[in-house]
Amino acid sequence: MRLVKQEYVLDGLDCSNCARKIENGVKGIKGINGCAVNFAASTLTVSADGKEEQWVTNKVEKKVKSIDPHVTVRQKHIKKSADDGYRNRMVNMLIRMAAAVILGAAAYLVQSGTIEFFLFLGAYLIIGGDIIIRAVKNIIRGQVFDEHFLMALATIGAFLIQQYPEGVAVMLFYQIGELFQGAAVSRSRKSISALMDIRPDYANLKTKNGIEQVSSEDVQTGDIIVVNPGESIPLDGKVVQGSAMVDTSALTGESVPRKAAEGQDVMSGFINQNGVLHIEVTKGYQESAVSKILDLVQNASSRKARTENFITKFAKYYTPAVVIIAVLLAFVPPLVLSGAALSDWVYRALIFLVISCPCALVVSIPLGFFGGIGAASKAGVLVKGSNYLEALNQVKYAVFDKTGTLTKGSFEVTEIKPAEGFTKDRLLEAAAYAELHSQHPIAESVRKAYGKMLSSDEIESYEEISGHGIFAKVNGTEILAGNKKLMEREQIEDVPDENAGTIVHVAVDQRYAGAIIIADEIKEDAAQAVADLKSLGIKQTAMLTGDSKQTGEAVGKQLGIGEVYAELLPQDKVAQVEALEAKLLPSEKLIFVGDGINDTPVLARADIGVAMGGLGSDAAVEAADIVLMTDQPSKIAEAIRIAKRTRRIVWQNIGFALGVKAIFLILGAFGIATMWEAVFSDVGVTLLAVANAMRVMRLKNK
């Protein structure tokens, strides 16, 4: 069955509570099996099996309109200026505010109580009529406890106890606050979008008629594009002419440019700093690095952090609870306390209603996490969900694969040790034929060391033995090449113990032929990566390798790794990770870092799987929870630092918002605070929380 996946922009979505309602509403549409609203990015992603795209769009538009008529659904590829809508709303609100202020001022000047009432009522309806209408519509739909209902109830209550000026003023300042909040959220969204907006706008396509500027989506695989100095490379490809220094920071987070010359691969998103590059396109727009990165980051909102889910549930119960307390506060004290005036206690209850809206939390928390994901992507770390970003704070066990992760994986033959009766050339030739069809870096190093032509026609049979090595029959000669386990399995005698490097043992016709010693260089930042993790509170580090125990322990000792598990088959690595996870407390997490070549099962099994080396292996990217765009293990510590900053800022907002609300609830209950102060505190807390949430993007990584 065909899966339809559509992404929409929700123009006018400035209410996080509305975002939650839209997500739940669209999820309830029959035929739609997946939905996620990203409030921070104003996007809605929907998936449906076996449905036409237009059917999905019509259903979504109808449902969104029924939930919030002010939100317009737009397909993502259709461009629209968001500023125009906001500017129109602002002008409209300023006119209404001016009219309300004039009527309110006139009410103070008249002597008649009736005229005063109608002037204040007119001012109230001008400034708050839309809030009343939305509250009534939501009540009809069964959506009672939202900010519109609370403000309508509080201000109408003020009119009922003849506090006309405060009823108008509270609605006026609430609308001003909404305007500022909308501006703050809009600015935050633009900041995050700008941070991640690495998609080139156009491509210079080389045609028979010269160079034509076209959309990147219109370029086909095999086309030649021209990238001038200062331009961004629009599509993945291979340089066929020219050379230049390219800035890769948008993808990798690395500030040092690297050279791109003829024959080298380049990725979309790289910026040409000098020279002119002619590039043959190797991947279409949807398969390019930039598209994959943006897709990963923007879809991260569908995997919400536990804190986000907690705040959503908290808001669901917090608002009704405060309303119930407000009702009790209004009517119980006058019944049990002698001399207590009903109007005084109703006024105090109205303060409860004003302060009960949890906007500061439900707006700033998603922005904080999305900002953290954006900051991580700018540093070359792609986090697939805010749940994984939050989980990085709980990591206590860091487990690394060795080859290609902590070492460069660029093997070189350093020594050839033939057994008695064999020459170095004969030993190397036998190993090269055995490794002819293998794609493993060790096999490539053996073939490179042999350096002569190899004919696959001479190979009569070939078998890769997982975790052991290779069996090949060449011109009637049986060759075994692999580790010591392979020699033991095939009962090869006289196999010596070798301690240095990675060893390929070779046997010819069941007779031991010798050993080839291969060295793998440790990455420059590997030791620092392990040290940084320990400084961040990681309790234990471990390394998994299929190499010999001596080789593994030598690398582990050099890097300061606590535990080394060697001579592991691919399936043994999964079992070992499970055994390590069993040692952890329920609140602790294990992170596994692999290079993505053969680590897919372990990446999928670990609490947090991290694939290194960018988007090269689709299977690894699919299985991993976090993708590093470079081959630097030190990026792990950087990701954890960003995660810790994000958590710190999110909990600052939670503590600040709840603290201020608690103070004003107490002050309101004792009759110390006024409705004016309550609405100022509510608006102020929200604006400060949004501003604080964006700090995560401005903090420099150390």
UniProtKB/Swiss-Prot annotation:
Q: Which residues lie on this side of the membrane: Extracellular?
A: 108-116, 164-166, 340-345, 671-678
Cytoplasmic compartment residues: 1-86, 137-143, 187-320, 364-648, 695-702
Identify the EC number(s): 7.2.2.12, 7.2.2.21
Matching entries from InterPro entries are given as: ATPase_P-typ_cyto_dom_N, ATPase_P-typ_P_site, ATPase_P-typ_TM_dom_sf, ATPase_P-typ_transduc_dom_A_sf, Cation_Transport_ATPase_IB, HAD-like_sf, HAD_sf, Heavy-metal-associated_CS
Give the binding site residues for Cd(2+). C15, C18
Q: Which keywords belong to this entry? A: ATP-binding, Cadmium, Cadmium resistance, Cell membrane, Cobalt, Cobalt transport, Copper, Copper transport, Ion transport, Magnesium, Membrane, Metal-binding, Nucleotide-binding, Phosphoprotein, Stress response, Translocase, Transmembrane, Transmembrane helix, Transport, Zinc, Zinc transport
Highest taxon above the source species: Bacteria
Instruction: Give the catalytic activity.
Output: Zn(2+)(in) + ATP + H2O = Zn(2+)(out) + ADP + phosphate + H(+); Cd(2+)(in) + ATP + H2O = Cd(2+)(out) + ADP + phosphate + H(+)
What does the record say about its membrane topology?
Multi-pass membrane protein
Tell me which Gene Ontology terms the entry assigns under biological process: cobalt ion transport; copper ion transport; metal ion transport; response to cadmium ion; transmembrane transport
Q: Name the positions where Mg(2+) binds.
A: D595, D599
What does UniProt list as catalytic? D401
Residues that hold Co(2+) according to the record: C15, C18
Q: Domain (HMA): give its ranges.
A: 4-72
- Matches recorded under Pfam families: E1-E2_ATPase, HMA, Hydrolase
> Mind telling me which GO cellular component terms the entry cites?
membrane; plasma membrane
Q: What does this protein do?
A: Couples the hydrolysis of ATP with the transport of cadmium, zinc and cobalt out of the cell. Does not seem to transport copper.
Which protein is depicted? Cadmium, zinc and cobalt-transporting ATPase
Q: Please tell me the species this chain comes from.
A: Bacillus subtilis (strain 168)
- What gene does the UniProt entry assign to this protein? cadA
